[in-house]
Amino acid sequence: MPLKRNTGLMILMLCTLALWAKSVSAGSSFLSPSQKPQVRQGKGKPPRVGRRDIESFAELFEGPLHQEDKHNTIKAPFEMGITMSEEEFQEYGAVLQKILQDVLGDTATAE
């Protein structure tokens, strides 16, 4: 009798283990069977944005001043907006240009 009982328990444990393994493997992915996981094509680094030379950087400051909103926008590798009056721009424009050239200019020529 104990042999039949042990065999029954062993079969019950195997069935339970098989059902548990199926439920664990079914919950391991959120994709449906018809969907395949996406594979990354390009594993390289994204391209870097290069520095601009001083001549092209100086061209950013040339151009008409917006009279209606008094908002100056400078576009470099990023965009920065400064709001000031025309008198303030006349007074501080050269200083701002020098600071931005020192910050964003080529490090070899800045030193």
Curated annotation (Swiss-Prot):
GO CC annotation terms, alphabetical: extracellular space
Lipidation (O-hexanoyl serine): 29
Coarse class of the protein's main subcellular location: secreted
Domain of life: Eukaryota
Any one biological process term the GO annotation gives: negative regulation of appetite
Propiece span(s): 53-111
Localization per Swiss-Prot or TrEMBL: Secreted
Any one GO MF annotation of this record: growth hormone-releasing hormone activity
InterPro entries xref list: Motilin_assoc, Preproghrelin
Signal sequence, start to end: 1-26
Spans annotated as Disordered: 28-51
Modified positions (Valine amide) in chain numbering: 49
Extent of Polar residues compositional bias: 28-38
Covalently attached lipid (O-decanoyl serine), positions: 29
Post-translational changes noted in the entry: O-octanoylated by GOAT/MBOAT4. O-octanoylation or O-decanoylation is essential for activity. The O-decanoylated forms differ in the length of the carbon backbone of the carboxylic acid forming an ester bond with Ser-29. The majority of trout ghrelin is Ghrelin-20 modified with unsaturated decanoic acid.
A Pfam family that the UniProt record links to this protein: Motilin_assoc
Keyword terms: Amidation, Cleavage on pair of basic residues, Hormone, Lipoprotein, Secreted, Signal
Tissue localization of expression: Highest levels in the stomach. Moderate levels in the brain, hypothalamus and intestinal tracts.
Lipidation positions, renumbered (O-octanoyl serine): 29
Family: Belongs to the motilin family.
Function in brief: Ligand for growth hormone secretagogue receptor type 1 (GHSR). Has an appetite-stimulating effect, induces adiposity and stimulates gastric acid secretion. Involved in growth regulation. Induces the release of growth hormone from the pituitary.
Protein's name in the database: Ghrelin
